Every structure is written in C-alpha cells, then in structure tokens.
Amino acid sequence: MHLIVGLGNPGSQYELTYHNIGFIIVDAICKHWNFQSFSKKADCLITSSVINDNKIMLMKPYSFMNNSGIPVARIRNFYKFSLDNVIVIHDDADLEPGRIKIKKGGGSAGHNGLKSIDSSIGNDYWRLRFGIGRSDSQRSLADYVLSKFSNLDDVIPLVERIAQNIHLMLQGNNIAFTNSIV
C-alpha cells in the first residue's frame, strides 16, 4: 500500500496558490482514478482506492504547511506505511515552473512542510517536486508561494498528466513517469 501526501494549506484563501500544488495534484489523482470523496480524520483529509492493483491512500494534511509532519506521522504509523511507500508531492521554488523531479531522501531545501515531515518520520521517503520557480519581482518567497498561479492554464494540463500517469511512479518506473509528463 502506498501513501501519497499532497502538501498545501487548508482554507479557500490558499486554493490555487503555488504552495498548494500538492493538494491540487492529489485532488486530480482522486478525480482521475475515481476515488471516493475525502473524509476528515483528525487533522487531515484521506481517501483510499486501488490504482492498477496498488492500494493507495491519498492524504491532505490540514494542519497548515509548517506542521504537516504531525498528521503524516500519525497516518503513517497507524497504517504501518514503509517509508519506501510514502510519496510527498510539493512545490519547489528551485525548479523552473512546470518542471518535475522525483527524488528519494535528501534535505528540505528550506521547505517548511518537508522540514516538519523530516522531523516527524525522517527523510527517506519519495518526493515529487513540482517546479514553481521564483518571483521576478521584489516580492519575498513567502509572499510568492502564497500567491495564486499566474499561469493556471499551463499548469492544469501538467497536473492532469501527473494524475493520469502516477501509476508508473507507483510501479517504480520513474523514468517512464517523468517522460510521460514532459
């Protein structure tokens, strides 16, 4: 069984912001693969189903980004997920917009959601990094990641391709997955 965690912040004011790309992608996976609606469990939303014979749980922590590790640890421990079967989807300001990278383990690169998860479960889990780039204005990174996508029409097809092809990543075929996205 795999746990796919989409990082983001709860609340309508954060919908469609760069920092909420994890929520956006998890919602797209849920829709594409016909999962049931999310249900609230303490400080997160979860749903589960099967994708190509792989049992999957989708999760959206509702504790705000900087405290994501607490609900992730709670769900991981309760359902006994191996770190090899945990995938965290998050925004990455160090990648150009629309670029994705898959990585296992490593540091947080200053991402507070990853810092929280690392401190709660360690850092040897899979990450699907979604490039959002950086603002070309004088705006701070914190203000930028909490702003709405300026290029949503470009982002939605990419999000849909990720959802359609996530089964390749679940099978460990990261190269085919990445190639199907670009």
Curated annotation (Swiss-Prot):
> Location of site Stabilizes the basic form of H active site to accept a proton?
91
Which GO biological process categories is it annotated with? protein quality control for misfolded or incompletely synthesized proteins; rescue of stalled ribosome
Catalytic residues (positions): 19 (proton acceptor)
Catalysis: reaction(s): an N-acyl-L-alpha-aminoacyl-tRNA + H2O = an N-acyl-L-amino acid + a tRNA + H(+)
Which Pfam family is one of this chain's hits?
A: Pept_tRNA_hydro
- Does the record bear Glycosyltransferase in its keywords? no
GO MF annotations, alphabetized: peptidyl-tRNA hydrolase activity; tRNA binding
Where would you find this protein in the cell? Cytoplasm
Q: Does the keyword DNA repair apply?
A: no
Entry GO CC: cytoplasm
Q: Which domain of life is it from?
A: Bacteria
Q: Which InterPro entries match?
A: Pept_tRNA_hydro, Pept_tRNA_hydro_CS, Pept_tRNA_hydro_sf
Q: Which CDD domains match?
A: PTH
Q: Note the site residues: Discriminates between blocked and unblocked aminoacyl-tRNA.
A: 9
Q: Which residues bind tRNA?
A: 14, 64, 66, 112
Q: Which PROSITE patterns match?
A: PEPT_TRNA_HYDROL_2 (PS01196)
**What is the protein's known function?**
Hydrolyzes ribosome-free peptidyl-tRNAs (with 1 or more amino acids incorporated), which drop off the ribosome during protein synthesis, or as a result of ribosome stalling.
The family classification in the record reads: Belongs to the PTH family.
This chain belongs to the protein called Peptidyl-tRNA hydrolase
Q: Which gene encodes it?
A: pth
